[in-house]
Amino acid sequence: DSEFELSKSYKPNKADWLDGTWTGFKTASFDARRGKTSSNEKDIKLIAKEIHSIPDEFTPHKRIKKIYNDRYQSIVNEKNIDWATAEALAFASLLADGYGVRLSGQDVGRGTFSHRHAVLYDQENEERFVPLRHFRKKQGLFEIVDSFLSEFGVLGFEYGYSQADPKTLVIWEAQFGDFSNGAQTIIDQFITTGERKWLRMS
């Protein structure tokens, strides 16, 4: 019973969740969690041109070249902007500001429904080119990783990555909705309860 009595006067040490690489961050208020995510039109159109430009010495598949041209024109014409184009612009806007973006999951480079095409392959020499990694001389690091089919392990790793590098947007994409079932323990025990239960942000 002595240990039980001692527990009544227990005071925890200071939480260290905002030390180290998290120095300078603070817990956001309810309203601040919505964030300011807008970009001005001029910047968006410049970024669109940069991320849809393929080097002359690179030979993409002709269909991929058409997709990239169509995406860029949708921005110029402000019409029929699809999900993949908007996603690429969002990622690029963060990268242009010096933040990192890391995307992992099964088949994320191409996109499960052949919609993303974030990784291109030269049709003559099979060299790999990632436009979001090379659109500016000074930009944040863009990583895109086709992970293996172990959702629990992969999401656990990505969650840890997000804690180690708070200035990188870390995204795990389940290939199909029910694939997230394999990672449900990580979702329940860490992602949705991390701040309250473990005093850890992500």
Regions found by a protein language model. Give the residues of each.
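Flexible, glycine-rich loop/tail regions that form catalytic "lids" or insertion modules at the edges
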Residues: D1-S202
